[in-house]
Amino acid sequence: MGEGFKSALIIALLTSILKNGYLLIDSAEAFHHPSSLEITSQMLTKSVKNNNVQVFLTTHSLELIDFLLEHASKEGIEGRLIYMRRDGENLISSMESFENVREMRETLGIDLRG
């Protein structure tokens, strides 16, 4: 069993334990083969919906963001994405609804990684 699959199972287990709670995931794409990211995002969104868990997640993976947006939409999950970018010496943060982010990605092809 690969590290990415183990990570996905741990996330699914934690969301069931943390029912009605919060889950923080740092570098969610770590140890994942790109092909396992979709499975992980699907497991996460289903588990979040079934267990009413609020997730705070960091990632550098545009693919994971796209998969999460897709599966959240299928599950009827509304969420927010906060992203940061540099403008010279300033760090600028923006918050968008999942719906707006999907539109930004699909229509404009915007890379949210800064």
From Swiss-Prot:
Which named protein is this? Uncharacterized protein MJECL11
Please give the organism: Methanocaldococcus jannaschii (strain ATCC 43067 / DSM 2661 / JAL-1 / JCM 10045 / NBRC 100440) (Methanococcus jannaschii)
Instruction: Spell out the Gene3D superfamilies in the cross-references.
Output: P-loop containing nucleotide triphosphate hydrolases
Task: Report the InterPro entries cross-referenced here.
Answer: Bact_Antivir_Def_Nuclease, P-loop_NTPase
Keywords per UniProt:
Plasmid
